[in-house]
């Protein structure tokens, strides 16, 4: 199995890095006692799950030889261990600690902040020497750090954005998870056709009814183009999910049809898309009760 060890200076961004790896699908453990690493790797190897563990000054062995022995033990068990070391300039670390008002782990030894930063560098030297990747976070944002990690681990700069396209009814309230909300209540309403009223936007007669209106087709086309314009930037911006909500009055006809059309379009483009119809689920539960 693949085991990523995130280590480095306190205040250099290990927690940010661990969250980024969690978004990439790694099983993440923060500050695991180092003697438990082989046991964790053995347990997770049965499910073929990759893992990431953060190690800092608090859970490192006192002897460099102990670290070497553990790494060799993992290698002998056919685990792929990769060490990523996060560094930052002394002035940057001092500023970050000043801004956060947190104590450095070595401050408990009655060291000043500058002395603690200096002492920590010596303790971490064995990990630095074994690191496959060293990143200085002094001048980069959290998004840039996450992107560098993706490039290193996955071989590509952008992770796959998961898109959720959902329909809803305004009378049930706005969906709390929506990033974008599009109101389609101004479009022709099949509800006023007695034959179409019991149907939904997934039924062919409703599809034919809405598909004949140019304003419906123009709305789908314009919304599709808008999303296609900005999707590349959203994919680069360290997002895991994008939720697009389409709403009409009851969430039964217009919003269902348009959400389905948009979702299927982006699926055909190779995007990872989930289509869901929130208010249809309410109608179904109501009718089956």
Curated annotation (Swiss-Prot):
Role of this protein: Displays ATPase and GTPase activities.
Keyword GTP-binding tagged: yes
Species of origin: Mannheimia succiniciproducens (strain KCTC 0769BP / MBEL55E)
The name this protein goes by in its record: Nucleotide-binding protein MS1718
PANTHER family: RNASE ADAPTER PROTEIN RAPZ (PTHR30448:SF0)
Family: Belongs to the RapZ-like family.
Binding site for GTP: 56-59
Domain of life from the UniProt record: Bacteria
């Amino acid at each position: 199995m693949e085991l990523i060890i995130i280590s480095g200076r306190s205040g250099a961004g290990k927690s940010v890095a661990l969250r980024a790896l969690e978004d990439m699908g790694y099983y993440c453990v923060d500050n695991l006692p180092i003697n438990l690493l082989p046991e964790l790797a053995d347990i997770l190897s049965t499910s073929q799950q990759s893992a990431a563990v953060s190690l800092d000054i608090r859970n490192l062995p006192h002897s460099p030889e102990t670290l070497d022995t553990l790494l060799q033990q993992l290698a002998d068990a056919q685990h792929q261990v990769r060490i990523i070391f996060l560094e930052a300039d002394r002035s940057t670390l001092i500023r970050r600690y000043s801004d956060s008002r947190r104590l450095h782990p070595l401050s408990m030894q009655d060291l000043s902040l500058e002395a603690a930063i200096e002492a920590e560098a010596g303790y971490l030297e064995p990990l630095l020497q074994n690191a496959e990747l060293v990143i200085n976070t002094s001048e980069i944002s959290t998004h840039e750090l996450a992107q560098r990690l993706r490039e290193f681990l996955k071989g590509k700069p952008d992770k796959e954005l998961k898109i959720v396209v959902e329909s809803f009814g305004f009378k049930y309230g706005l969906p709390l998870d929506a990033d974008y909300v599009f109101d389609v209540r101004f479009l022709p309403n099949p509800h006023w056709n007695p034959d179409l009223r019991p149907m939904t936007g997934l039924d062919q007669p409703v599809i034919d009814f809405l598909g004949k209106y140019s304003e419906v087709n123009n709305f789908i086309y314009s919304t599709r183009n808008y999303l296609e314009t900005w999707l590349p930037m959203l994919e680069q911006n360290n997002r895991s999910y994008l939720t697009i909500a389409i709403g009409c009055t009851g969430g039964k006809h217009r919003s269902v049809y348009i959400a389905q059309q948009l979702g299927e379009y982006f699926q055909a483009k190779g995007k990872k898309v989930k289509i869901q119809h929130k208010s249809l689920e309410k109608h179904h539960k109501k009718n089956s009760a």
